Amino acid sequence: MYQDKILVRQLGLQPYEPISRAMHEFTDTRDNSTLDEIWLVEHYPVFTQGQAGKAEHILMPGDIPVIQSDRGGQVTYHGPGQQVMYVLLNLKRRKLGVRELVTLLEQTVVNTLAELGIEAHPRADAPGVYVGEKKICSLGLRIRRGCSFHGLALNVNMDLSPFLRINPCGYAGMEMAKISQWKPEATTNNIAPRLLENILALLNNPDFEYITA
């Protein structure tokens, strides 16, 4: 079925705000004939504060901008070396509930890490994916008119020190991890294709078209 097809956009390294605006515009103007899209992107350093975010969880942002976001969740950090995947899906058309989508995204990351020999798991009390007690992937979604936007952020080979300036996702002392701690050769270039392959498998392997910026 044609509408089952997904457009995959590799956007490279981009500032947060223009991508966020584009994502909102796409979601606001899409209709039932609009193909779903997955955007793969890295962001320049930025803290984003989710809808549930509290100012006290931003400890000392320093020179890194803080931007309000309408995704679910609390504050997180994006920076180069972190693979962000935005999922712009018509949930009604794909017969997916919100909880099912969260589980699907978490499983995408768990499966990707398993291929690398890294044992990871989701947590019922704190969305995202963890290796031991350390968080390696953050998750934040918004649903509008039955369509999802925002998505996940997987730490690949980034500088983790900016996370010390916040309480990640509202948890004081939450330790963060990245793939390169176990796989020094990991980069977003070699992780993104695995991530994409795993999410498409969980979406029942729809046709897709890959577009580079």
Swiss-Prot record:
Residues 32-207 form the BPL/LPL catalytic domain. The keyword Glycoprotein does not apply. The active site is at C169. It catalyses: octanoyl-[ACP] + L-lysyl-[protein] = N(6)-octanoyl-L-lysyl-[protein] + holo-[ACP] + H(+). One of its GO terms (cellular component) is cytoplasm. Disulfide bonds: none annotated. GO terms for biological process: protein modification process. Gene3D superfamilies: Bira Bifunctional Protein, Domain 2 (3.30.930.10). Its EC number is 2.3.1.181. Substrate binds at R71, G72, G73, Q74, V75, T76, Y77, H78, S138, L139, G140, G151, L152, A153. It is found in: Cytoplasm. It is an enzyme of class 2 (transferase). GO terms for molecular function: lipoyl(octanoyl) transferase activity. It holds the Pfam family LplA-B_cat. The record marks K135 as: Lowers pKa of active site Cys. SUPFAM superfamilies: Class II aaRS and biotin synthetases. Keywords: Acyltransferase, Cytoplasm, Transferase. Pathway: Protein modification; protein lipoylation via endogenous pathway; protein N(6)-(lipoyl)lysine from octanoyl-[acyl-carrier-protein]: step 1/2. In the reaction, the free carboxyl group of octanoic acid is attached via an amide linkage to the epsilon-amino group of a specific lysine residue of lipoyl domains of lipoate-dependent enzymes. Catalyzes the transfer of endogenously produced octanoic acid from octanoyl-acyl-carrier-protein onto the lipoyl domains of lipoate-dependent enzymes. Lipoyl-ACP can also act as a substrate although octanoyl-ACP is likely to be the physiological substrate. Belongs to the LipB family. This is Octanoyltransferase. The gene is lipB.
